[in-house]
């Protein structure tokens, strides 16, 4: 595939006010995307955003660019990323555009695209947009300018879609659930979904102010929800990230349940209810314990590269339905076309209610191996992944853990980080080995 100038593993992302996340570039991006999509006969796209203060500015810039290309725009307002994917399909729009930097701090933002099937835009279309960005921005004649309008019932439509994915003959009336929306795009949606299905809902992270998204709350900061579940004597907790495509859960003891354990619970329930369809896709970061537990159930397991895009690609290749990253991107193609935190939570709650077991009980079949992920910020000229000392240390650790664990070293696709992951049977040993490699990565300039 050709080298990409702008699109990363999850669209275009960066610091607001610095290229490419500037009003000027984003307007030109809207125009370039509009030109490419117009060549496919497009007349309408949808734009949604999370709750970052910069979302208003970038939404206006995109709207102007698409209008200049002659494309009509439907403005969804604050909307979870999977909700934008769903509405893109139901509105028969040619594309859905998400303004979000997901789990990143408020001062970052990004743009990514969904196709008319609610999936991430094909590589060929992204590359065509990149090529168009190299051309001067123009404008269609006045009579052909695109129009923009607000989609006033967007949240209600998505709430009803989520509820339709929960069995109609059962209720959540016996459950008390803490829901943490990370002050993000699900703040006005997730609590209503679970409440309308009968649950008693305790909300946290549902007061966005433009700058508090993901701040000390949500799926990337679990201390608050763990404490709330225990204090309120709740049955469980559901934590979503800023754009709603990532989920973590908490059982009644405050124990944090990640994407590996969530997909295990869903796969087990599918097996028990006769809905098992193929295997499960994880990633290079998935805990070895998941692989072993699924093997015990005679469920196939395959690893993709890190990133929900790669999980989706491998699911399509194998014709399977279930995939997840341990970071909380959970995909169930029986229900959605992309990772969806609310839908994943409903899949788990289906298991809780149908099996009449607590979340604590449902996770007992999976024994997670101790795993440590060390993130090393990196801005040097040389690539640590090619450094001789780092590679020698990785080989040494792999030899030490032969048959008992593994080591993985990779670059983040969205931030200037080198991720060092070590997994093994003993946490003290894992910590020692991970820090040994991380210290060498820090020395690379």
Swiss-Prot record:
PROSITE patterns (alphabetical): PGM_PMM
Superkingdom, natural source: Bacteria
Maturation and modification: Activated by phosphorylation.
Cofactor note: Binds 1 Mg(2+) ion per subunit.
Chain segments annotated as transmembrane: none
Swiss-Prot/TrEMBL catalytic activity: alpha-D-glucosamine 1-phosphate = D-glucosamine 6-phosphate
Binding positions (Mg(2+)): 102, 241, 243, 245
PTM annotation (Phosphoserine): residues: 102
EC number annotated for this UniProt entry: 5.4.2.10
Top-level enzyme category: isomerase
HAMAP family hit by this protein: GlmM_B
Entries under NCBIfam families matching the protein: glmM, PRK10887.1
Name of the protein this chain belongs to: Phosphoglucosamine mutase
Organism: Colwellia psychrerythraea (strain 34H / ATCC BAA-681)
Species classification: Bacteria, Pseudomonadati, Pseudomonadota, Gammaproteobacteria, Alteromonadales
């Amino acid at each position: 595939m050709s080298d990409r100038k702008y699109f990363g593993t999850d669209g275009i992302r960066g610091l607001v006010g610095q290229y490419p996340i500037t009003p000027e570039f984003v307007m030109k991006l809207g125009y370039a995307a509009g030109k490419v999509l117009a060549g496919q006969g497009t007349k309408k796209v949808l734009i949604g955003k999370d709750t970052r203060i910069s979302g208003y500015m970038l939404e206006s810039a995109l709207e102007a660019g698409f209008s200049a290309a002659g494309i009509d725009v439907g403005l969804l307002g604050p909307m979870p990323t999977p909700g934008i994917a769903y509405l893109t399909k139901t509105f028969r729009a040619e594309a859905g555009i998400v303004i979000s930097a997901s789990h990143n701090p408020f001062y970052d933002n990004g743009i990514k695209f969904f196709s008319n099937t609610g999936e991430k835009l094909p590589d060929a279309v992204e590359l065509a947009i990149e090529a168009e960005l190299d051309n001067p921005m123009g404008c269609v004649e006045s009579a052909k300018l695109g129009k923009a309008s607000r989609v006033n019932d967007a949240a209600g439509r998505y709430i009803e879609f989520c509820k339709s994915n929960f069995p109609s003959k059962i209720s959540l009336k016996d459950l008390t659930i803490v829901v943490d929306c990370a002050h993000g795009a699900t703040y006005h949606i997730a609590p209503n979904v679970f409440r309308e299905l009968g649950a008693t809902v305790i909300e946290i992270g549902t007061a966005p102010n433009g700058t508090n998204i993901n701040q000390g709350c949500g799926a990337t900061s679990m201390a608050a929800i763990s404490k709330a579940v225990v204090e309120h004597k709740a049955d469980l907790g559901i934590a979503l990230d800023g754009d709603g495509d990532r989920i973590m859960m908490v059982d009644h003891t405050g124990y944090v349940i990640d994407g590996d354990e969530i997909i295990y619970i869903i796969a087990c329930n599918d097996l028990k209810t006769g809905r098992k369809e193929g295997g499960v896709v994880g990633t290079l970061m998935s805990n070895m314990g998941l692989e072993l537990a699924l093997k015990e159930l005679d469920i196939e397991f395959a690893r993709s590269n890190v990133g929900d895009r790669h999980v989706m690609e491998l699911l399509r290749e194998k014709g399977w339905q279930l995939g997840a990253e341990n970071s909380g991107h959970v995909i169930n193609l029986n229900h959605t076309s992309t990772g969806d935190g609310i839908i994943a939570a409903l899949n788990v709650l289906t298991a809780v209610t149908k099996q009449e077991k607590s979340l604590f009980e449902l996770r007992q079949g999976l024994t997670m191996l101790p795993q440590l992920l060390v993130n090393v910020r990196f801005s040097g000229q040389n690539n640590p992944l090619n450094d001789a000392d780092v590679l020698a240390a990785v080989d040494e650790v792999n030899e030490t853990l032969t048959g008992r664990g593994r080591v993985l070293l990779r670059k983040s696709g969205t931030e200037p980080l080198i991720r060092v992951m070590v997994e093994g049977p003993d946490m003290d040993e894992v910590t020692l080995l991970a820090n040994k490699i991380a210290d060498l990565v820090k020395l690379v300039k």
